[in-house]
Structure formats: C-alpha cells, structure tokens
C-alpha cells in the first residue's frame, strides 16, 4: 500500500526542504542587497573623487564626528580645510556633497534641480506637499498663485499688526523681569511671530499670545524640528513602519496631530467668517488678498480649486515657515545685540532719532534705519535661520573651477558654512555690521539667509519687515544684556536653534 504524500511520516522532510529553500532565497536576497550597496558605494566614490574629505569609517562614514550636536562646529572646521565643497559620508554607502562656496551655490541655485526627496519626505506627514516640498510644474503653479499675497500693497498694512504683536510680548516681559534675573526669550518670540502670522496672513482676530492653546502648537513645532532631525540621522528609523512602532514615531504622530488641529481650526474659522453676510463681498472688493484668502479663492490653471489636502499643506507650510524661522532670526539678533552693547547703543540712538518720543512705527520708517539694518543682516550671517537646504542633481554639473558631478548626487547646501567661510568673509566669527554698509561689495551669493534663486523664500520681504519692527520696538523699551551663566549653543535643526535656550537679562528703559 502506498504512503500518502501528506502523511505524518513525510511532513518533517517536506518542512525541512521548504526551510532550506527559504534560507537559500533569503541568503540570495542578502547577497543581492549587499552587491547593490557595494555598487552604489563604488559609484559614489567615483562621483566624489575630485573632492577631498576627512578619512571616514567604511560602515559608519563620518557619523562619529557628528555626535552630540557637533554638526555646525564640524562644518566650520571642514570649511577652513577643504575649499569649495567636501563629501560628507553619513554611512558606508550614503554620502552628500557639503557645499559652501558662493560660486558653487550660484550655479546650483540657478538651476531647477529638485530638493533631495529622501531628506524632505520625512517632513511630509507634518507639512504635506506645500510650497516647501513641491517640485516641478506644480511648484511653479503654487508659487505663481501665492506671490500676490506678498505684494508691497499687502505688506504695508501689516506693519500695524506687527507692532501690536511685538507690544504684547514686551508688555509681558515687563511683568516677568526682575532685578538681574534672566529670561529664556525663544518661547516668547515664537508666540509673538505666530501671533503676527496669524493676524497678517490668516485674518485672525485676537492674539494667540493670550491664548494658552497656542502654547501646545509651539511645543509641537519644537518637537517636530527635533524629531525630523534625529530621524534623518538614524538608520533604523528610515522605515515608516518601524518608525511608527518606536516611541519617537508615536511622539511624531501626536505632534503632527496637534499641529494639524491648529491649522484646521484656522481654516475652518476663516471659512465660517466668509459665510457671514457682507464678509465675502468685502473680501472681493480688496485690491489684493491675504495669504489664506488667496488659497481659498485660488483657481488652478485647469480651473479647479485647491483640494482640501493642498490647502492644508500650504497653510501648514506657511504657518511653520512664517513663524519658526522668523522667531529664530529675532531671537539670535537679540542675542547678537546683547553681546555687542556698542552696536546695540548705536541702533537705539538711530531708532529713537527716527521715532522721537513716540513708539509708533510705520512702513516708511523701516527703510530709514540703515545701521540697524546692517546689524540685523550681520546677525543673520552669524545665525542663519535655515542653516542648510538640499538638492539632488537632475543632470550633470560642472563648477567654475572645473570640478564636476554626475546626475543623482545629493548636495547639502550649507548656508551656515557659507556664512563662516573665511575665503568669503574675513574673520567670519567676528560681529562686524560694516560688512553690510551701503557702499560695501560682496559676492551675490555670499549672504543667503533666505536662500537664493527661483526657490528663495517667498516671504523674504515680510520677514525683514517683521525683524525690523521687533528690533526697533524692543530697543526703545529695553536694554538687552547677556546671561554669562547660560551662553546659547547653536544647533542645526530644520531651523537654527539653541541647545540650551537663549537667555537674556532685560533692563527696562525710562
């Protein structure tokens, strides 16, 4: 009698055979993956061979040199040692070219290469595909659609709203300060810049500085800054599935929820306002619309309105970009002036001479403070709010010095490295506002606090106006002094932050 193929006596042998086949397939896949990684490493070595760099570990790359938030310090050292650009190996088969030469940056920013998708995709659950992350024709359409929201006619009335937000912050400071005590200012400045963007761009009535719910949004943005930065540098967190299972992934998901709840509330409130009698007609009579109204009334080239997903992505993007980068700029400018009292005093004299006894400030005043503007620009050079951007070459490039790169290489455009490049700026660590005197000359791409080229910051003029208003009104009311016991340590995140906060002592004037 024959024995069935499914009988118990045959099962162990069949199972053993299946396991052997599975093990063989697994080994084959591992070998194929290893070969793929090896070939990619060899391609990178050939692609970057014209650019010297420090020795790196075959598996870990330069990662050991960038531990404990030493990225900015390490970049400064490489800028001094390796002219123009330097390969940065994140691991044995993953590298990007660190670029900090103005001629190189002029070439790259003058092209239409996309942002490096792997780097920026980590931000998509947070801000979606808005202007920051879009590429190609869709980016061009959105940019053209939003540009009217930043016309001078729109920006002029915003000065009064900026003044209101800054004065609320300064009133709060008067209540908090005591003799010789210091204040961590970044949180306060973040609320002020969020207040400003809400009033100016989103038609918000009231002040988020007086609303406790806004504090959770600020904390969520701070958490997202840190989480995106650390995830980009953790090889085990590149998988979305594995990241969602980790404690960091769960915190990221919760922070995204908090940020989205805030922006959804803003959109729904404005939509509700537009349903009120007379409000829609009032908006239609405006010569130019503010940011949110541009989005709500927008028509794409095919005649369709923005989808809810696209609308929220643009609001999330501008809510973050419009307040967090400016908060970084204002806070570091205050610190720079606090540590250079002679320049702070001269700025105050200029502002007092302009405003007289009153503290009101107008659009016209903002172009009549040359020395204060010089100090603001020098602080932005030392502390660029966005320390870097990335690009992935869509075609080969040859730089002015003859060195070239093939298609596919990822470039890390270090604004921070550029601003500390001693071949571009003499004594780059010295605070010297006269670098930006009206008669001074410097390379067109030597100073890029708002990036450059077609993808420069769309809100550049808005941000500069806000910086000037904040500095002018603050210096009229307070003397800024450093806290020698808590010197801020700049660290690279999506936005330039301080590892230990920015603490200043404030002395009320008059």
Swiss-Prot record:
One of its GO terms (biological process) is arachidonate metabolic process. Keywords: Endoplasmic reticulum, Heme, Iron, Membrane, Metal-binding, Microsome, Monooxygenase, Oxidoreductase, Transmembrane, Transmembrane helix. Its EC number is 1.14.14.1. Induction: P450 can be induced to high levels in liver and other tissues by various foreign compounds, including drugs, pesticides, and carcinogens. It is found in: Endoplasmic reticulum membrane; Microsome membrane. The keyword Transmembrane applies. GO terms for molecular function: alkane 1-monooxygenase activity; arachidonate monooxygenase activity; heme binding; iron ion binding; oxidoreductase activity, acting on paired donors, with incorporation or reduction of molecular oxygen, reduced flavin or flavoprotein as one donor, and incorporation of one atom of oxygen. GO terms for cellular component: endoplasmic reticulum membrane. It is a single-pass membrane protein. It holds the Pfam family p450. It catalyses: an organic molecule + reduced [NADPH--hemoprotein reductase] + O2 = an alcohol + oxidized [NADPH--hemoprotein reductase] + H2O + H(+). It comes from the Eukaryota. It is an enzyme of class 1 (oxidoreductase). The chain crosses the membrane at residues 11-31. Its cofactor is heme. InterPro entries: Cyt_P450, Cyt_P450_CS, Cyt_P450_E_grp-I, Cyt_P450_sf, Cytochrome_P450_Monoox. Heme binds at residues 321, 457. Residues 1-4 form a propeptide. Cytochromes P450 are a group of heme-thiolate monooxygenases. In liver microsomes, this enzyme is involved in an NADPH-dependent electron transport pathway. It oxidizes a variety of structurally unrelated compounds, including steroids, fatty acids, and xenobiotics. Catalyzes the omega- and (omega-1)-hydroxylation of fatty acids. Belongs to the cytochrome P450 family. This is Cytochrome P450 4A4. The gene is CYP4A4.
